[in-house]
Curated annotation (Swiss-Prot):
PANTHER family: METABOTROPIC GLUTAMATE RECEPTOR (PTHR24060). G-protein coupled receptor activated by glutamate that regulates axon outgrowth through the MAPK-cAMP-PKA signaling pathway during neuronal development. Ligand binding causes a conformation change that triggers signaling via guanine nucleotide-binding proteins (G proteins) and modulates the activity of downstream effectors, such as adenylate cyclase that it inhibits. Residues 874-895 are annotated as: Disordered. Residues 616-627, 676-702, 776-788, 851-915 are cytoplasmic. CDD domains: 7tmC_mGluR7, PBP1_mGluR_groupIII. This is Metabotropic glutamate receptor 7. It comes from the Eukaryota. One of its GO terms (molecular function) is group III metabotropic glutamate receptor activity. It comes from Mus musculus. The chain crosses the membrane at residues 591-615, 628-648, 655-675, 703-723, 754-775, 789-810, 826-850. L-glutamate binds at residues 159, 180-182, 230, 314, 407.
Length: 915
């Protein structure tokens, strides 16, 4: 079984496919079922919903034995905290009413492989059994006792154990909430997606420790880590954060091996190694209790009392046991631990536990023997180092020392987090059902996980319990210093806290022999490449290293010089190198969006044009003014095409086409729209004066007017070509950032921002003029073709270009100018084209394709009908009305004298008439 567990750990680390792991799980689960026959030690509590629990009840055993001595605080205290929390929840009428929480609690023996074997108990109910071919000796089918279904797991404690268990539980989608695992790698939501924790990850405490070290003025420290995920990942996080923060050097990183032949010799060697850098007095420790105790003992043997300045992680926290008999060597040690509070209710609960009232805890008898150093008369007693008999009348806290273990609060919070998630899940899925409804039973772990990640309640310490997207709790730490001198109560003293930022009371700190002055842990390492030495007066052996900043490089040991204009410092600032040349790439996010929009627009434009050509002689197409419609669609098409020219690699040909087409598409579009709106305006203005049709309203005249307007744009472009021929340049100023590593030379066309605006200026003038005409014709009856759609188009287009101008010029000094301006320009043109296409043509295409019954000739309209409509519109405009637009026609009829000539005209449908 152990070998299979080790094999699974290897396969998990090698990221084997889930199918392979699941096959092995079936084998392991079968073995686990057999294992229960001879290893029955687990706690079972019946309930409607069962939670799993993983606790280090025992320490690691010697070679060949999975479990060792019982762990009174880390094991029994935490286990009883879960039982206490279950009792509290089950007696709370407001939390999970009509639902009883049960439990299946297992011992991990502080070993990841053993914990893996134990945790297979949680997945037995999820493994299908095929018993179709199985018969008992009497010929009857077998009856299997279905194991309880575990919906979530509380635990584990050690990070290495949680990592191993999490790999199994995620395969069966069982959510897991740890109360003590802080390894940073557990924050990887891709690998440990069903893992959450009520304690912050080590990356947070590493940041807190970096802040502490810097606040004390130390810039030269060593690190010490126990071998394993917790220690090594903690130091890795500390090192990474210290590098990012700057001003902090790591003298050396020492690892404490897990398997040691001679503990004394190994730890003496570690102390000697730390003394190789005597100026690095500060030692940052991520280690377990036993390693902390051994390193302090080794420092004492080396007669280094007062030399080392210890900075301990939460594994040290405020524990007394690792410091026993080594208080003098530990004086001044600074430690941190997650902010916590003593749960008074648990103290009352635990100190009242006896052998009689706590039979549900199968390990409590063993704890009793160890705690009171006595031997029970029951069979199976493991206490062999004493002849003192237990009476059963001993009391915890009275006949033995008792102090609440530091993680009790987090165990309770973890159980409550699971309970709150189940409570909200029950309310949502079983609103009108008492207890656990079938929908909740079948919901699965993935749904429960969503509820877990959304919990937010005040925990046992009064602080909010919540999880971020990676399942981590927020970082809140208390900072302690161990003080024994000049104090009436030797021990840990609270000197600060860390919640995203450090609050440290330096005046409350003291060091060896009661010294208040902060001892130093600083010295100067040789300057790195790219730094110059700046010697300090009176200390020639130490100096400050000043980096060559900006575009400087290290000319010699004492001097920095500037690189040439088109160069930047190399990576280590020992010389200069050419600045890379960049352009807007097709795969860049800045280009992908405009290109995507342009491609959609081109497809839509071609579709509209094809539809109009296909139905060229239908009333709707003829009513829209076929000639100008095709001109307008051509302009819209060119507006989309310019996107590709703006993103293409600049050369003389591309730059030439940019100049031609930059404003041409817009010019064609707005010239056609201006001609249309002007024609509508002139017709209705003329209709108010006489029945004579205005001049130049025929299709040929309209095309001639449009061509004349477009020719002005082309003439301006040709003059531009003659005055300033197209060319390409490399602009080093645009991307010459403060950080030379980000400096780039921009390959672009020799076109200034002002030239771009001038090229677009004529088109904008046409757009504004067209908007003016759209406003003037806003009172035209809605059935007179395209006056109002054109108006809406122009209003929207004006908004687009009003937004474009501040963005375009507001980013002129930005390091991302090339990308922002190009993207803004192309998107603005795409949006302008899309607005025109969507408002003017999509409704027509919709009718043509989906409602052909509306695409019919209703009645032709003479100019007299237009005159009549103009007269009616004029009369209507003189009478104020509060009615909505939908009642305009009714009011039009109400305001016409029935005896007037206009009123005697027959009502004419204005649909599909060319205006």
């Amino acid at each position: 079984m152990v070998q299979l567990g080790k094999l699974l750990r290897v396969l998990t680390l090698m990221k084997f496919p889930c199918c392979v792991l699941e096959v092995l799980l079936c084998v392991l689960a079968a073995a686990a079922r057999g294992q229960e026959m001879y290893a029955p030690h687990s706690i079972r509590i019946e309930g409607d919903v069962t939670l799993g629990g993983l606790f280090p009840v025992h320490a690691k055993g010697p070679s060949g034995v999975p479990c060792g001595d019982i762990k009174r605080e880390n094991g029994i205290h935490r286990l009883e905290a879960m039982l206490y929390a279950l009792d509290q929840i089950n007696s709370d009428p407001n939390l999970l009413p009509n639902v009883t929480l049960g439990a299946r609690i297992l011992d991990t023996c502080s070993r990841d492989t053993y914990a893996l074997e134990q945790s297979l108990t949680f997945v037995q109910a999820l493994i299908q059994k095929d018993t179709s071919d199985v018969r008992c000796t009497n010929g009857e089918p077998p009856v299997f006792v279905k194991p309880e279904k575990v919906v979530g797991v509380i635990g584990a404690s050690g990070s290495s154990v949680s990592i191993m268990v999490a790999n199994i539980l995620r395969l069966f989608q069982i959510p897991q909430i740890s109360y003590a695992s802080t390894a940073p790698e557990l924050s990887d939501d891709r690998r440990y997606d069903f893992f959450s924790r009520v304690v912050p990850p080590d990356s947070f405490q590493a940041q807190a420790m970096v802040d502490i070290v810097k606040a004390l003025g130390w810039n030269y420290v060593s690190t010490l880590a126990s071998e394993g995920s917790y220690g090594e990942k903690g130091v890795e996080s500390f090192t990474q954060i210290s590098k990012e923060a700057g001003g902090l050097c790591i003298a050396q990183s020492v690892r404490i091996p897990q398997e040691r032949k001679d503990r004394t010799i190994d730890f003496d060697r570690i102390i000697k190694q730390l003394l190789d850098t005597p100026n690095s007095r500060a030692v940052v420790i991520f280690a377990n209790d036993e390693d902390i105790k051994q390193i302090l003992a080794a420092a004492k043997r080396a007669d280094q009392v007062g030399h080392f300045l210890w900075v301990g992680s939460d594994s040290w926290g405020s524990k007394i046991n690792p410091l026993h008999q080594h208080e003098d060597i530990a004086e001044g040690a600074i430690t941190i631990q997650p902010k916590r509070a003593t749960v008074e209710g648990f103290d009352a609960y635990f100190t009242s536990r006896t052998l009689e009232n706590n039979r549900r805890n199968v390990w409590f008898a063993e704890y009793w023997e160890e705690n009171f150093n006595c031997k029970l008369t029951i069979s199976g007693s493991k206490k062999e180092d004493t002849d003192r008999k237990c009476t059963g009348q001993e009391r915890i806290g009275k006949d033995s020392n008792y102090e609440q273990e530091g993680k009790v609060q987090f165990v309770i919070d973890a159980v409550y987090a699971m309970a709150h998630a189940l409570h909200h899940m029950n309310k949502d899925l079983c609103a009108d059902y008492r207890g656990v409804c079938p929908e909740m039973e079948q919901a699965g772990g993935k749904k429960l996980l969503k509820y877990i990640r959304n919990v937010n309640f005040n925990g046992s310490a009064g602080t909010p319990v919540m999880f971020n997207k990676n399942g981590d709790a927020p970082g809140r730490y208390d900072i302690f210093q161990y003080q024994t001198t000049n104090t009436t109560n030797p021990g840990y003293r609270l000197i600060g806290q860390w919640t995203d930022e450090l609050q440290l009371n330096i005046e409350d700190m003291q060091w060896g022999k009661g010294v208040r002055e902060i001892p130093p842990s600083v010295c100067t390492l040789p300057c790195k490449p790219g730094q110059r030495k700046k010697t300090q007066k009176g200390t020639p052996c130490c100096w400050t290293c000043e980096p060559c900043d900006g575009y400087q490089y290290q000319f010699d040991e004492m001097t920095c010089q500037h690189c040439p204009y088109d160069q930047r410092p190399n990576e280590n600032r020992t010389g200069c190198q050419n600045i890379p040349i960049i352009k807007l790439e097709w795969h860049s996010p800045w280009a992908v969006i405009p290109v995507f929009l342009a491609m959609l627009g081109i497809i839509a434009t071609i579709f509209v044009m094809a539809t109009f050509i296909r139905y060229n002689d239908t009333p709707i197409v003829r009513a829209s003014g076929r000639e100008l419609s095709y001109v307008l669609l051509t302009g819209i098409f060119l507006c989309y095409i310019i996107t590709f020219l703006m993103i293409a690699k600049p050369d003389v040909a591309v730059c030439s086409f940019r100049r031609v087409f930059l404003g041409l598409g817009m010019c064609i579009s707005y010239a056609a729209l201006l001609t249309k709106t002007n024609r509508i305006y002139r017709i209705f203005e003329q209709g108010k004066k006489s029945v004579t049709a205005p001049r130049l309203i025929s299709p040929t005249s309209q095309l001639a007017i449009t061509s004349s307007l477009i020719s002005v744009q082309l003439l301006g472009v040709f003059i531009w070509f003659g005055v300033d021929p197209p060319n390409i340049i490399i602009d080093y100023d645009e991307h010459k950032t403060m950080n030379p590593e980000q400096a780039r030379g921009v390959l672009k066309c020799d076109i200034t921002d002002l030239q771009i605006i001038c090229s677009l200026g004529y088109s904008i003038l046409l757009m504004v003029t067209c908007t003016v005409y759209a406003i003037k014709t806003r009172g035209v009856p809605e059935n007179f073709n395209e006056a109002k759609p054109i108006g809406f188009t122009m209003y929207t287009t004006c908004i687009v270009w009003l937004a474009f101008i501040p963005i375009f010029f507001g980013t002129a000094q930005s390091a991302e100018k090339l990308y922002i301006q190009t993207t803004t320009l192309t998107i603005s043109m795409n949006l302008s084209a899309s607005v025109a296409l969507g408002m003017l043509y999509m409704p027509k295409v919709y009718i043509i394709i989906f409602h052909p019954e509306l695409n019919v000739q209703k009645r032709k309209r003479s100019f007299k009908a237009v005159v009549t409509a103009a007269t009616m519109s004029s009369r209507l405009s003189h009478k104020p009305s509060d009615r909505p637009n939908g009642e305009a026609k009714t009011e039009l009829c109400e305001n016409v004298d029935p005896n007037s000539p206009a009123a005697k005209k027959k009502y004419v449908s204005y649909n599909n008439l060319v205006i």
